[in-house]
Amino acid sequence: MNHSVIIPPLKRIAVMGTCVPRQCGIATFTNDLQQALKNSDPDLCSTTIALTDDANTYAYPPDVALEIQQATPASYAVAADFLNVSNVDLVSIQHEFGIFGGEAGEYILVLLRGLNAPIVTTPHTVLATPNAAQRRVMDGIIEHSSRLVVMADKGRRILQDVYDVPTEHIAVIPHGVPDRAFIDPAMAKHKLGLADRTLLMTFGLLGPGKGIETAIRAVPALVRDHPNLPYMIVGATHPNPIRDEGERYRDSLVALADELGVSENIRFVHRYLPLAALLAPAAACHLHRHSAVPGT
């Protein structure tokens, strides 16, 4: 880990990650982080470096200074050179294995090795049992980062116990929530046609590894005691499985609900909901099942 770098007073920050309007949880996080930085210090110059999947083009906001074509190794070297000549004081990287190119997202190492500025990395997935490629990439990220930021104490423990990261090089900053006006839960449930029912909900982009199948398999036991229990699964399928196999994953979830005889209790909302549209169903639910990888 890069222990020797002293981070100077910050005047110029670059934030790297996927970026809206790309439909990705990291993109939303990057957007929220940028907004928080701007609100914290009007004099701070904060720009975004956006990771773009090669199959799509996006109408990015003006603060996106550069795009990295995530499947092109040379694009990462270009980004490092761009940031070096931009004289940024800090690079904040949002890391998820799947948004960087190469095996286990190894192209990020091209960027890290070329950067001059201090690096603060937020790993959005902290794997307790990485495979060899994931371990190699994570070790490289740790080596080049001045600080690692995780959103849960479990992530800190994994970094310490599995990756031998010293405590003083880890910051735990809990994930924020939107500051919004109060929405009456009873009214929200009424609008969804679920008045007087206890609502279980999962939202976010769907894909293997988030345990949705496990939740669906639990529904038969739940409805024995709560026959009118609705389980709402909100979100479009993640673009990566869509690219590789179309809607096979979502179809498998629907088939599983049919097989278990609980299709009447499970409601799929098959679209990506922006924050404003998500607030009402979130207010209506009694129990939210979080679907992120443990340790994030």
Where are the predicted features?
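Conserved donor-binding/catalytic core segment of Leloir-type glycosyltransferases
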Residues: 15, 194-210, 216-219, 232
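N-terminal strand-loop element at the rim of the active site
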Residues: 21-23, 34-87, 237-239
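Short N-terminal targeting/anchoring amphipathic segment
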Residues: 66-68, 80-105, 118-122
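A conserved, positively charged/aromatic
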Residues: 113, 127-146
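A short helix/loop element that forms part of the nucleotide-sugar donor recognition site in Leloir-type
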Residues: 182-194, 199
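Nucleotide-activated donor-binding/catalytic signature segment of Leloir-type glycosyltransferases, i.e.
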Residues: 235, 244-272, 276
